[in-house]
């Protein structure tokens, strides 16, 4: 049985962490691509030398040539300019569209059948651009957003309630930005709804609202603390969870930026936006779940924000 091949486009902090986690999870051989000469090669050599210590036996290669992506089973894209203090995800739009064009063409010519996960921000627009330039079908391309946002929501809830984070089920829908929608109605702690926990006085509505707000600003909080970069451990872990579900046909239902068809969740056009999504060996399948009227209204605001950015991206491409 042939070993799987994971291509990581972008050898920065997220790319390097993705490579390390791929080896630890024993997902397959790794190709680390970057346009910076020496960077992917150096990180690949360092990672390769960790394999005897980690007890794994996989190949790790660094490259500046898109041809080395040939026959990749999974491609995870992190290439692009990261957020800096005071910069929104949307400020990155013009710069990273050009990056997605180069990456998309690299995928199209070398591994068009790969399962593609986009992590580059602004996420919902970049995954749309990546599909445009790569030609990858709807079921084989997805954006990493909701897994990370939901993990942040779960972390903050567990910390506030002083419970194991493994007992907290919490979900976030919508765009990967300030308009994301943490689903308080669907979220629970060991089966007990957040609404019930508020009634029992375990958490106040004010504290819950502040956690929702903190979740929306989760990435910005880390950017402000780091000052010279953005999050990478949790984003990489989220990307690997998605890749593993595909490679091992785990059929996990994860909140991801999948392409939903017009009519689903009230959208009037096909659109990449964060929704519950099954990831299996067949690719991605968006799933409809019932949400409250308030959450529907919030989701529509988020959808509109994504649509506006898509329009802005289209204008940039037209000029």
Curated annotation (Swiss-Prot):
GO molecular function annotations of the record: L-lactate dehydrogenase activity; L-malate dehydrogenase (NAD+) activity
EC nos: 1.1.1.37
Keywords from the named record: NAD, Oxidoreductase, Tricarboxylic acid cycle
Listed InterPro entries: L-lactate/malate_DH, Lactate/malate_DH_C, Lactate/malate_DH_N, Lactate_DH/Glyco_Ohase_4_C, Malate_DH_type3, NAD(P)-bd_dom_sf
GN (gene name): mdh
GO terms (BP aspect): lactate metabolic process; tricarboxylic acid cycle
SUPFAM superfamilies, per the entry: LDH C-terminal domain-like, NAD(P)-binding Rossmann-fold domains
Binding-site positions, substrate: 83, 89, 121, 152
Signal peptide: none
Annotated active site: 176
Reaction catalysis annotation: (S)-malate + NAD(+) = oxaloacetate + NADH + H(+)
Entry protein name: Malate dehydrogenase
Family annotation (Pfam families): Ldh_1_C (PF02866), Ldh_1_N (PF00056)
Domain of life according to the entry: Bacteria
Reported function: Catalyzes the reversible oxidation of malate to oxaloacetate.
Binding residue positions for NAD(+): 10-15, 34, 96, 119-121
Family of this protein: Belongs to the LDH/MDH superfamily. MDH type 3 family.
Species this protein is from: Francisella philomiragia subsp. philomiragia (strain ATCC 25017 / CCUG 19701 / FSC 153 / O#319-036)
């Amino acid at each position: 049985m042939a070993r799987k091949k994971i291509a990581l486009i972008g050898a920065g902090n997220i790319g390097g962490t993705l490579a390390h986690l791929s080896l630890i999870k024993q997902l397959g051989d790794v190709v680390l691509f970057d346009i910076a000469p020496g960077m992917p090669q150096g990180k690949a050599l360092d990672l390769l030398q960790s394999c005897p210590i980690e007890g794994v036996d996989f190949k790790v290669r660094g490259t500046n040539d898109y041809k080395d992506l040939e026959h990749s089973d999974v491609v995870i894209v992190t290439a692009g300019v990261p957020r800096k203090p005071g910069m929104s995800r949307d400020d990155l739009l013009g710069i990273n569209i050009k990056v997605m064009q180069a990456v998309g063409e690299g995928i199209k010519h070398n591994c068009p059948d790969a399962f593609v996960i986009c992590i580059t921000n602004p996420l919902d627009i970049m995954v749309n651009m990546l599909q445009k330039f790569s030609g990858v079908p709807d079921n084989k391309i997805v954006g990493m957003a909701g897994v990370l946002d939901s993990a942040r929501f779960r972390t903050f809830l567990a910390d506030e309630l002083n419970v194991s984070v493994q007992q907290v089920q919490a979900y976030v829908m919508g765009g990967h930005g300030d308009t994301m929608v943490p689903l308080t109605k669907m979220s629970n702690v060991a089966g007990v709804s957040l609404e019930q926990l508020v009634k029992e006085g375990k958490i106040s509505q004010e504290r819950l609202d502040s956690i929702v707000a903190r979740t929306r600003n989760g990435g910005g909080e880390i950017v402000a603390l780091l000052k010279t970069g953005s999050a990478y451990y949790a984003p990489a872990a989220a990307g690997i969870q998605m890749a593993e579900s595909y490679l091992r046909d785990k059929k996990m239902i994860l909140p991801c930026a999948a392409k939903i068809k017009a009519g689903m969740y009230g959208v009037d056009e096909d659109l990449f936006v964060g929704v519950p999504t099954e990831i299996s060996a067949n690719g991605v399948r968006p799933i409809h779940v019932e949400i409250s009227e308030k959450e529907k209204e919030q989701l529509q605001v988020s959808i509109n924000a994504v649509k506006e950015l898509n329009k802005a991206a289209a204008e940039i491409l037209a000029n």
